Curated annotation (Swiss-Prot):
It is found in: Cytoplasm. The lineage of its organism: Bacteria, Pseudomonadati, Pseudomonadota, Betaproteobacteria, Neisseriales. Its EC number is 2.3.1.274. It comes from Neisseria meningitidis serogroup B (strain ATCC BAA-335 / MC58). This is Phosphate acyltransferase. Homodimer. Probably interacts with PlsY. GO terms for cellular component: cytoplasm. Keywords: Cytoplasm, Lipid biosynthesis, Lipid metabolism, Phospholipid biosynthesis, Phospholipid metabolism, Transferase. It is an enzyme of class 2 (transferase). Coiled coil: none annotated. The gene is plsX.
Length: 351
């Protein structure tokens, strides 16, 4: 039986999204129990109204909620009984294999880092997410917004934890291909930090394939793509906006005249398949990667379907036990990175 902790009060709409999303998820997974944190009276009423299977839900009453615009340090210091903090505590205490929250990203990252700590050798956790491609291939992208300013060592650490996670989840595919997001594929391009990261990864034991431009990510050119949080977040929001724009443009075009409406009827099966593949809700649920525990961040503005998919991500991560398998591999890869860094410093000093 998999047990997940759910911050029921987090997100733009709180219980209106988390409860129906959790109910639908439980109905699809009889092997799951949920610990839902939040105001017990409100939670019980909402769960009963939604027809949730109460025999597989434990309610953990909390008295506080982290605001969506609340400063991370304020949440960490003043909201120790928040639904977010208590959900993460369930993972720390071994009562749940993963925690899911649609709450304030900064507060979630700060709280999770404080409660769970990071994997030894990893300075900062990163927001990581699996993105679709034009095939059935998926690519793990990180960092998507947690760290807007990174050193080359931190970017290299992201590459290590991303590569180790993908390898743990798909060992049959061999060493994951790691790409560094840049403005061009040549090793002379990019900021000083990116160029230094390139050299570190080039001399590491990772399967580093070099720089990758953002327009190649959705074509499955790499299994792991690494960027700082500023670039990664802009990249992610651009992809989400482009998908939304294209979906709307196709819909408007097919509704523009009678001939196009008839054509839409004929193309309906293909259009449904395309809509399903591009539905951003299916890819809701980002991993706070680098922590000693599983925490999944749901988009704060998602609906019940999107929240259900965030729970699906937590379920698959918990069931695969991928994160529990990566610490040894991370330690070995980080040791190789230190060697690469020493060689790089020697080369610079000899100039």
């Amino acid at each position: 039986m998999i047990t997940l902790a759910v911050d029921a009060m987090g997100g733009d709409q709180g219980l209106a999204v988390t409860v129906p999303g959790a109910t639908a998820f439980l109905q699809a997974h009889p092997d799951v129990r949920l610990i839902m944190t939040g105001d017990e009276t409100q939670l019980r009423q909402a769960l009963t109204a939604a027809g949730a299977p109460m025999e597989r839900i434990d309610i953990c009453h909390t008295t506080q909620v982290v605001g969506m615009d609340e400063a991370p340090q304020s949440a960490l210091k003043n909201k120790k009984d928040s639904s977010m903090r208590v959900a993460i505590n369930q993972v720390k205490e071994g009562k749940a294999q993963a925690a899911v929250s649609a709450g304030n990203t900064g507060a979630l990252m700060a709280t999770a880092r404080f409660v769970l700590k990071t994997i030894p050798g990893i300075e900062r956790p990163a927001i990581a997410k699996f993105l679709p491609s034009d095939t059935d291939h998926v690519t793990l992208a990180l960092d998507l917004g947690a760290n807007v300013d990174c050193t080359s060592e931190q970017l290299a650490q992201f590459a290590v934890i991303g590569s180790e996670l993908v390898h743990a989840l798909h060992p049959q595919k061999g060493q994951p291909r790691v790409g560094l997001v840049n403005v061009g594929t040549e090793d002379i391009k990019g900021t000083d930090t990116v160029k230094q990261t390139y050299k570190l990864l080039q001399n590491s034991k990772l399967n580093f394939i070099g720089n990758i431009e953002s327009n190649g990510i959705l074509y499955g050119e790499a299994d792991v793509v690494v960027a700082d949080g500023f670039v990664g977040n802009v990249m992610l929001k651009t992809i989400e906006g482009a998908v939304k724009f294209m979906s709307g443009a196709i819909r408007r075009e097919f509704q523009s005249n009678l001939f196009n409406k008839l054509a839409a009827v004929a193309a309906l099966p293909a259009l449904k398949g395309l809509k399903n593949k591009l539905d951003p809700r299916k890819f809701n649920g980002a991993i706070l990667l680098g922590l000693r525990g599983i925490v999944i961040k749901s988009h704060g503005g998602t609906d019940e379907t999107g929240f259900r998919y965030a729970l699906e991500e937590a379920y698959h991560e918990a069931k695969s036990a991928g994160l529990s398998k990566i610490e040894q591999g991370v330690a070995e890869q980080l040791a190789a990175l230190e060697t690469a860094k020493a060689v790089q410093n020697e080369n610079v000093g000899g100039l």
